[in-house]
Design a protein with these regions (language model features):
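A detector of single, family-specific signature residues
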Residues: 1-393
């Protein structure tokens, strides 16, 4: 067996090749982070291998810097291990008391870790899907948050330009309202619109739900409006609505990509009543490989949902007086709480559990956190057994 250690950087990678007998086959050499460099690495590896020789390639998880070299290695069919830098650091310290930290040392350390057969798992298709899913779900999270801020801006601008509008429609954030405000971004412009044209705009955007009566109601309200006449704010409103529409389209594209990966993964998580694809995808993406966790409690700690304990001298606060740690993955914590709300609504077992906790006098959010813990234990069991909800429950 040969072990290849790669220390990844932005522009270049340091590599080291070691045999299972401890022989240095290729002392630390540097390749550029480009096609020529990747080919050099591949040819060097092949120089020391035969069909019967097992290969292990290891590199540190360095975020986006490792994506391209990792993809290349996987495409060439080389078993690749992505190692947490913390583990590399601890392993290096266990080998030497000297505080040496260079790329050359790291390349050797990674190869030595592979040779020592410490508990490492090779990068798999599942890991690839999880990484893709994490990128997509976090990207969607950011886009949705960006859209929410823009919607707040719309509400603020409507309060200035046409404050009566909000009481005449179920929500300002309807396609019909956006269509109206895109063409008539102030009460004055709505008041001066031809009724037939106003009706056509509303009818087309609402798919016939709003017609002449709504158009007349809005125009009458606009003519009595106390809204300000501020062309700059009207322009800002039009541009803000356009940005929201663009974000709507982008989010839809992201959700399509998420759905495609979820279809390929075929996780049983979406068989839980109330567990949608979007929240299920975030949970799977943030947890990643379930085999990394010995128990559901480890996942709860990773999500920052374990109760914290304060201890000073003889004083120890825990149990009823403890608070959630709120460390770990905020994305996972967000998804678990939101998914739990829906699961408690749609599933009788979880609904009864939430009601039981509320009957014990617990605040709604505290009761919900208990239900979230119950949910993560269920998900853990389902992912381990690959059974659907009804079989796992």
């Amino acid at each position: 067996m040969i072990c290849v250690g790669i220390d990844v950087a932005k522009d270049k990678h340091d590599c080291f090749i070691l045999s299972s007998e401890g022989e240095i086959l290729a002392d630390v050499f540097t390749i550029q982070n480009n096609a020529e460099g990747f080919d050099t690495l591949l040819q060097t590896i092949r120089r020391y291998t035969r069909p019967e020789v097992k290969i292990k390639v290891g590199l540190e998880a360095t975020g986006h810097y490792s994506y391209n070299i990792l993809g290349f290695l996987l495409d060439k069919g080389l078993p690749t291990y992505v190692i947490n830098p913390l583990h590399t650091n601890l392993y290096r310290k266990s080998l030497s008391l000297r505080k040496t930290k260079t790329d050359r040392v790291d390349a050797r350390t990674i190869a030595a870790m592979l040779m020592s057969d410490v508990d490492l798992k090779s990068y798999t298709d599942t890991a690839y899907h999880n990484e893709e899913l994490k990128s997509l779900t976090r990207y969607r999270f950011d886009k949705v948050r960006e859209r929410a801020k823009l919607k707040q801006s719309v509400s603020r601008l409507v309060t200035i330009l046409f404050p009566e509008l909000e009481k005449l429609v179920p929500s300002l954030h309807l396609a019909s309202v956006y269509a109206l405000l895109s063409e008539f971004p102030s009460a004055k412009q709505v008041a001066g619109a031809h009724l037939t044209h106003l009706k056509a705009v509303l009818s087309d955007a609402s798919k016939g739900r709003y017609g002449r009566d709504m158009a007349a109601t809005l125009r009458d309200a606009a003519r009595r409006s106390v809204g300000s006449i501020m062309p700059a704010k009207s322009l800002e409103l039009k541009h803000t609505i356009r940005l929201i529409r663009e974000l709507d389209a982008e989010i839809e594209d992201i959700e399509t990509a998420i759905q495609a990966i979820m279809d390929e993964m075929q996780s049983p998580i979406t068989t839980i009543p109330g567990m949608g694809v979007r929240m299920g995808a975030v949970i799977l993406a943030e947890i990643g490989d379930f085999s990394r966790f010995d128990s559901p409690d480890k996942i709860l700690a990773y999500a920052g949902m374990s109760p914290s304990t304060y201890q000073s001298g003889q004083l120890s606060l825990s149990g009823a007086y403890s608070h959630m740690e709120k460390r770990g993955s905020r994305y996972l914590r967000y998804a678990l709480y939101n998914a739990t709300k829906y699961v408690c609504h749609w599933d009788p077992t979880f609904a009864a559990y939430l009601a039981k906790k509320r009957a014990e006098g617990k605040h709604y959010n505290v009761a919900l956190s208990h239900a979230a813990k119950k949910l993560i234990r269920l998900i853990y069991a389902m992912e381990k057994s690959q059974q659907s909800y009804r079989n796992a429950a």
